[in-house]
């Protein structure tokens, strides 16, 4: 998944495979496709946010530990526990109760996660027909949901206490949805044709 490049200060440092491909092939293709005059106009990936909401944690606080453990295994980074901003009596929710976990990935970890997501995790989804090309937010950012955490190979299926879904947001520097779609398609995101 990584390619090694020579760096004077630290010696050999691995460069994520997808990042290498973006620099060498994808950026040039996008520049040609959208006829950018400046290299800074070429869209790139800024960060990936992985969010796991655990609404049942309001009744059982131990459930949040499983979500934190799963997210840490999937992303390789310690998740931030998200707490309720205000109390809602109908949901038996009090202000400050843990209700989810979130991880923001940047840099090499982000590229490695995207590579694993596209090449390993998404193909493991049962009856997968591709991602919807319409879930862009108008500014080139893409958000989609995954219904179960077992599609990631880091999760041991025998140790799953309950099935949890997650939201994955890919934030890009693209200014339009078409640019963002072209970038993610070039990175290997399997969008279905409508």
Curated annotation (Swiss-Prot):
| Pfam families according to UniProt | Ribosomal_L5, Ribosomal_L5_C
Which terms under GO biological process does the entry name?
translation
Q: Which GO terms describe its molecular function?
A: rRNA binding; structural constituent of ribosome; tRNA binding
User: What does the UniProt keyword field contain?
Assistant: Ribonucleoprotein, Ribosomal protein, RNA-binding, rRNA-binding, tRNA-binding
Mind naming one GO cellular-component term on file for this protein? ribosome
- The superkingdom listed in its UniProt entry is Bacteria
| Quaternary structure note | Part of the 50S ribosomal subunit; part of the 5S rRNA/L5/L18/L25 subcomplex. Contacts the 5S rRNA and the P site tRNA. Forms a bridge to the 30S subunit in the 70S ribosome.
Family listed: Belongs to the universal ribosomal protein uL5 family.
What's the protein called, per UniProt?
Answer: Large ribosomal subunit protein uL5
């Amino acid at each position: 998944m990584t390619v090694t490049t020579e760096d004077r200060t630290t010696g050999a440092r691995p460069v994520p495979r997808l990042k290498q491909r973006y620099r060498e092939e994808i950026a040039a293709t996008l520049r040609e496709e959208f006829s950018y005059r400046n290299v800074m106009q070429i869209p790139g990936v800024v960060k990936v946010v992985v969010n796991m909401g655990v609404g049942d944690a309001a009744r059982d606080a131990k459930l949040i530990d499983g979500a934190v453990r799963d997210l840490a295994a999937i992303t390789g980074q310690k998740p931030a526990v998200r707490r309720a901003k205000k109390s809602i009596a109908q949901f038996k929710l009090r202000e400050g109760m843990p209700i989810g976990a979130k991880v923001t990935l940047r840099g090499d970890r982000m590229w490695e996660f995207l590579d694993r997501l596209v090449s390993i995790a998404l193909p493991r989804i049962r009856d997968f027909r591709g991602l919807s090309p319409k879930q862009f937010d108008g500014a080139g950012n893409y958000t989609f949901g995954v219904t179960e955490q077992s599609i990631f190979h880091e999760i041991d299926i025998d140790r799953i206490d309950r099935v949890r879904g997650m939201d994955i947001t890919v934030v890009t520097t693209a200014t339009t949805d078409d640019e963002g779609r072209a970038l993610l398609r070039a990175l290997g995101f399997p969008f279905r044709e409508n």
